[in-house]
Amino acid sequence: MELLLHLSELSAEPLHAQISRQIRAQILAERIAGDDPLPSIRALAREHRVSVITVQRAYEDLEREGLLRSRLGKGFFVAEIPGGARREMAVRRLEEALGRLVAAAEAEGLARAEIRAVFERLLRAKGSTR
């Protein structure tokens, strides 16, 4: 299986976090099916020119989240996740991310009405996909 990952060493986000974030998004969007094998740690590290430890950390983070499972001697596989649980995970992550953004915006003095207006403007600009 080939994973579509776009990694940037210029990003403030650590490489292992970029890897886990992008794999997580593909799993939650069901672009990677349950029980699909992931590339070996070494293969993914070689393909993206990162250290084995970086990929291992990303895979282990996703395993702790319940998105991957490891099979001794066989590697990492996407966990079987019911559709409802996938949506709950995605909603929870969205709430966490938006919570951080709202807190940062409020710390900079923006009112909730301004935050809401920005959010709604972004949604309109993005257009409806569902």
Feature locations, PLM:
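Extreme N-terminal segment that seeds HTH/winged-HTH DNA-binding domains in transcriptional regulators
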Residues: 1-37, 43, 89-130
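Beta-hairpin "wing" of winged helix-turn-helix
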Residues: 31-36, 61-73, 77-81
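Aromatic side chains
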Residues: 16, 48, 59, 76-77
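N-terminal helix-turn-helix
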Residues: 37-69
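Short, charged/polar, Gly/Pro-enriched secondary-structure boundary elements
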Residues: 84-87
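Generic signature of intrinsically disordered, low-complexity segments enriched in small/polar residues
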Residues: 19, 51, 62, 79-80, ...
